[in-house]
Amino acid sequence: AIFTIRNNXQQTVXAGAVPVGGGQXLDXGQTXTLD
């Protein structure tokens, strides 16, 4: 499965809700893809 996380908010968010993501931070508009 492929999971795409996008931060649509104005602030930086941590993608810590996804264990595989390792809690990386996403700036506004950034995406992270996990497979």
Swiss-Prot record:
Belongs to the thaumatin family. This is Thaumatin-like protein 6. InterPro entries: Osmotin/thaumatin-like_sf. SUPFAM superfamilies: Osmotin, thaumatin-like protein. Induction: By phytoplasma infection.
